[in-house]
Design a protein with these regions (language model features):
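Residues lining hydrophobic/aromatic ligand-binding pockets adjacent to catalytic sites
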Residues: 1-228
Length: 228
């Protein structure tokens, strides 16, 4: 079976991690020309004011021709400190935050040079905490998307900012099922820190699921993704 092809992602979404939970291996695109305004360098968390986007400042060493593997991080502003403070403020009341916070903080404070290195470290952190056994490899060459897209090509579906969250051009099929392009994702509700204020917010960064459900998160991941 052909392994799914994904883009890299910063603090990847529940749907992203759900795909990994259902497969023995995936391939992550690194040879593409880096696209703007996607979840390759941003993540969504739930705060007391609603959904907050965490944006990672990046640098294109070769301008518009820079590949994803060449993208570096800018530390002109202390974004990593701001992100961590936002995460603490959002999840300090979550049941499992104290169990998982130290290692995540360490990764964010390491000042990685490349975006791909940061994302890879965060991805392996989540794989370990969710107890997901999925081998990660990276592309050697760029393969353009086909039309219609291959069922295993998820590079756009899982990281396009217009299709990740339920209020961004998605079609709601039921209370917890949403259609992203040709795929249907069912997001079983789980307790969240601010659910009495905003209701259930599906498909945030997977740290939302981790901090709220802890060791009970993996069964929910297995209910989230479609079978590819």
């Amino acid at each position: 079976m052909t392994p799914p092809l994904l883009s890299t992602a910063y603090l990847p979404s529940v749907a992203y991690m759900a795909v990994l939970a259902r497969h023995d291996s995936v391939v992550i695109e690194q040879k593409e020309t880096f696209p703007k305004q996607t979840f390759r360098n941003r993540a969504a968390i739930a705060t007391g004011n609603g959904v907050l986007m965490l944006n990672v400042p990046v640098v294109r060493p070769y301008g518009n021709h820079t590949r994803t593997e060449q993208m570096t991080l800018s530390y002109n502003e202390p974004w990593h400190i701001r992100h961590w403070r936002a995460i603490v403020a959002a999840y300090s009341a979550a049941p499992y935050f104290l169990y998982y916070r130290d290692e995540l903080e360490k990764i964010l404070m390491q000042r990685h040079e490349r975006l791909l290195d940061l994302n890879d470290a965060l991805l392996h952190y989540l794989l370990k905490k969710f107890k997901i056994d999925c081998q990660i490899s990276y592309t050697d060459n760029f393969t353009p998307p086909t039309a219609p897209p291959s069922p295993t090509d998820l590079r756009t579906i899982l990281t396009n900012k217009h299709t990740l969250l339920t209020n961004k051009s998605t079609h709601q099929l039921s209370d917890s099922t949403f259609q992203f392009s040709i795929f249907n994702f069912h997001f079983p509700p789980y307790p969240q820190v601010f659910d009495t204020r905003f209701g259930f917010l599906p498909n945030l960064s997977a740290i939302d699921l981790l901090f709220n459900l802890g060791p009970e998160a993996k069964p929910l991941l297995l209910q989230t993704t479609p079978i590819l």
